[in-house]
UniProtKB/Swiss-Prot annotation:
May play a role in the wound healing process. May promote epidermal proliferation, remodeling and regeneration. May promote the chemotactic activity of endothelial cells and induce neovascularization. May counteract high-fat diet-induced obesity and related insulin resistance through increased energy expenditure. This is Angiopoietin-related protein 6. Keywords: Angiogenesis, Coiled coil, Developmental protein, Differentiation, Disulfide bond, Glycoprotein, Secreted, Signal. Residues 219-229 have a biased composition (Polar residues). SUPFAM superfamilies: Fibrinogen C-terminal domain-like. PROSITE patterns: FIBRINOGEN_C_1, FIBRINOGEN_C_2. CDD domains: FReD. Its main location: secreted.
Length: 457
């Protein structure tokens, strides 16, 4: 606008000068105008071209809106996960506080009455069982918290990628492509705050640093297990058609993949883990320890019926094992692994349990293997729990060793003890998951599996 006025002023001055000279002489006036830069788009498109460009813009806008809706759905899912993480974190802290109170109460009562009678010992055993139940619940809650932590990180990463893609598309649409008009930026959905994800991880680390760290499970997600020790961290396939007589029958029918199978034991159908690849397959897993997620310090009825999940830590049950081993001659295989990754095996060429009327007494054959024989000392002994004491010791071995087993006076092995993290542990009693001939009684093993199958002729 200022440039136009300047030109007009120059023209008026020239006309005034010409008139002042009386118009006697004719002058030729040449105006030199500086070139001006265009400040707005110059449209040379025809109506058909404009319609085509408008259709292209609408198509791109539609794709933007579709991406935005997907991003908003992700944000909603992330918000729900964030709420669940907050609730689980609060629950974990509450469980941790309760667990500390139970431990303090247990230690106080143990110091107050060192020589326990039958009734106080049973009461103390129940108190210890409650403490271990609280520990197992805390471990499960923390594992769930870490799983949600991983999901939150994944969602945050995906949403960041979507936001970056939307930004690139917006910049491309806003560029000077054939005189197109600029597209207004789309509003982006807010990302899941990384501070929340970090706080979940910090909570998990705080649980690992509790004074009783030896009792806490490994909170890192287990990687794919070795073929030596079957575990439930792998995806469980659909169960083959059953129920089967035993895992060997399923293996003989062509089901060679390890997983959960249904076995018919008497009038019951029981879900078990069949190990179909270890040493020829056909093995029924009757016990597994791997992460401390299940409390094995429990009573007679639980040990009789079984507890845990076949794809994770579990005890098949004394009665189901009796039913399995009463169907012909069976062998027993025990697989062990320490915290350094060293594996060992113990094999017994015959194995069975007597019925409940004989307290599920253990019957073993000859030992073979490289783990050392730490179970034959328990041969011909009845099963004992904290509420059914049938060992040869004047006290209660199940109370001191924190788990049911075929105790003598008391034990050279106990694979049903407390799962301590890291191997060597400090405890008033020898109550870890141990095999005396393999790493000793003061070392709690990382993994232990007991398997049985029909003897193959």
């Amino acid at each position: 606008m200022g440039t136009a006025r300047l030109r007009k002023l120059q023209l008026l001055l020239l006309l005034g000068a010409w008139r002042a000279l009386g118009g006697a002489a004719r002058c030729r006036v040449t105006l030199v105008l500086s070139p001006q830069k265009a400040t707005s788009a110059v449209c040379r498109s025809s109506e058909a071209t404009q319609d085509s460009e408008l259709a292209t813009l609408r198509m791109r806008l539609g794709r933007h809106e579709e991406l935005l809706r997907a991003l908003q759905r992700r944000a909603a899912e992330g918000g729900a996960l964030a709420d669940e993480v907050r609730a689980l974190r609060e629950h974990s802290l509450t469980l941790n506080t309760r667990l500390g109170q139970l431990r303090a109460q247990l230690q106080q009562e143990a110091r107050a009455e060192p020589d326990l009678g039958a009734e106080p010992a049973a009461a103390l055993g129940l108190l210890a069982e409650r403490a271990l139940d609280a520990e197992a619940e805390a471990r499960r809650t923390t594992a769930r918290l870490q799983q949600l932590d991983a999901q939150l990180r994944e969602h945050a990463q995906l949403m960041s990628q979507h936001s970056s893609l939307l930004g690139r598309l917006q910049r491309a649409c806003a560029g000077p492509e054939r005189g197109q008009q600029q597209v207004l930026p789309l509003p982006l959905a807010p990302l899941v705050p990384l501070s929340l994800v970090g706080s979940a991880s910090n909570t998990s680390r705080r649980l690992d640093q509790t004074p009783e760290h030896q009792r806490e499970q490994s909170l890192r997600q287990q990687g794919p297990p070795s073929s030596l020790l079957p575990t439930g961290h792998l995806a469980v396939p659909t169960r083959p058609v059953g129920p089967w007589r035993d895992c060997a029958e399923a293996h003989g029918a062509g089901h060679w993949q390890s997983g959960v199978y249904d076995l018919r034991l008497g009038r019951r159908v029981v879900a078990v883990w069949c190990e179909q690849q270890q040493e020829g397959g056909g093995w029924t897993v009757i016990q597994r320890r791997q992460d401390g997620s299940v409390n094995f310090f429990t009573n007679w009825q639980h040990y009789k019926a079984g507890f845990g999940r076949p794809e994770g830590e579990y005890w098949l049950g004394l009665e189901p094992v009796h039913q399995v081993t009463s169907r012909g001659d069976h062998e027993l295989l025990i697989l062990l692994e320490d915290w350094g990754g060293r594996a060992a095996r113990a094999h017994y060429d015959s194995f069975s349990l007597e019925p409940e009327s004989d307290h599920y007494r253990l019957r073993l054959g000859q030992y073979h293997g490289d783990a050392g024989d730490s179970l034959s000392w328990h041969n011909d002994k009845p099963f004992s729990t904290v509420d059914r004491d049938r060992d040869s010791y004047s006290g209660n071995c199940a109370l001191y060793h924190r788990g049911g087993w075929w105790y003598h006076a008391c034990a050279h092995s106990n694979l049903n003890g407390v799962w301590y993290h890291g191997g060597h542990y400090r405890s008033r009693y020898q109550d870890g998951v141990y095999w005396a001939e393999f790493r000793g009684g003061a070392y709690s093993l990382k993994k232990a599996v007991m398997l049985t199958r029909l003897v193959r002729l």
